[in-house]
Amino acid sequence: MNNRVHQGHLARKRFGQNFLNDQFVIDSIVSAINPQKGQAMVEIGPGLAALTEPVGERLDQLTVIELDRDLAARLQTHPFLGPKLTIYQQDAMTMDFGELSQKMGQPLRVFGNLPYNISTPLMFHLFSYTDAIADMHFMLQKEVVNRLVAGPNSKAYGRLSVMAQYFCQVIPVLEVPPTAFTPPPKVDSAVVRLVPHATPPHPVKELRLLSRLTTEAFNQRRKTIRNSLGNVFSPEVLTSLGIDPAMRAENISVAQYCQMANYLADNPPSKES
């Protein structure tokens, strides 16, 4: 028996497909999402409709984004969901969620069992549209959820942690074992809720600087900040910001990264490095 086949569909490795089939887990996720009629609900990667059906039952209209042409076609002809669905057969990484929010006339509520092979880049894509998003609920690798919620001084803390927490309140919801899927993935999974901040707790003047700083610092996470960011910060400047130059990237809080980005915005280096 081929354990990659579920409901007559062969799971495609290149799309990172693992289909949710545990009813308790499905009910728990739908309860956490709590979809209501009139809301702009958007599902990424509906697959074989494990979440689409119970969410769609509560709604008059549901927008879905599905890259797999065969699965998009199945949804189009779904016996009771079909008429409710607006289907975008495309890669979610190419979706303009700001434009979609304008079209739907309100902030989006985004959810999905995300393909694990694109979950991190998709998170960064969605962060650029947080002003158009009310909240997000995603099934992800447990390791990715751990990184999203991690605080300083932990191995899981990294660039994803800083950027996610800059944009959103991050709330773990549920842990999910591999047996809840067909085919079962080789890793544990978890559901997370991301609620964009109405106002960032630590506003930055230029987001590109926060992105650049976190990239440079965490690309050399074993180095001290004095060394990894020495091209833009002198030890004296770091000390004046209340940051020990001997600290490493994983020791610096979200607030401190934002403080550093704002210093750079006000005091740009004479030459871009």
From Swiss-Prot:
GO CC terms of this entry: cytosol
UniProt-annotated location(s): Cytoplasm
The enzyme's E.C. designation: 2.1.1.182
Pfam family, any one: RrnaAD
Gene3D superfamilies the UniProt entry points to: Ribosomal RNA adenine dimethylase-like, domain 2 (1.10.8.100), Vaccinia Virus protein VP39 (3.40.50.150)
Binding residues for S-adenosyl-L-methionine: 18, 20, 45, 66, 91, 113
Catalytic activity: adenosine(1518)/adenosine(1519) in 16S rRNA + 4 S-adenosyl-L-methionine = N(6)-dimethyladenosine(1518)/N(6)-dimethyladenosine(1519) in 16S rRNA + 4 S-adenosyl-L-homocysteine + 4 H(+)
Top-level taxonomic group: Bacteria
Primary location recorded for the protein, binned into one broad class: cytoplasm
Alphabetical UniProt keywords: Cytoplasm, Methyltransferase, RNA-binding, rRNA processing, S-adenosyl-L-methionine, Transferase
Keyword rRNA processing included in the entry's annotation: yes
Any GO molecular function: 16S rRNA (adenine(1518)-N(6)/adenine(1519)-N(6))-dimethyltransferase activity
Entry function: Specifically dimethylates two adjacent adenosines (A1518 and A1519) in the loop of a conserved hairpin near the 3'-end of 16S rRNA in the 30S particle. May play a critical role in biogenesis of 30S subunits.
Entry's family note: Belongs to the class I-like SAM-binding methyltransferase superfamily. rRNA adenine N(6)-methyltransferase family. RsmA subfamily.
Name of the protein in its database record: Ribosomal RNA small subunit methyltransferase A
Gene name in the database record: rsmA
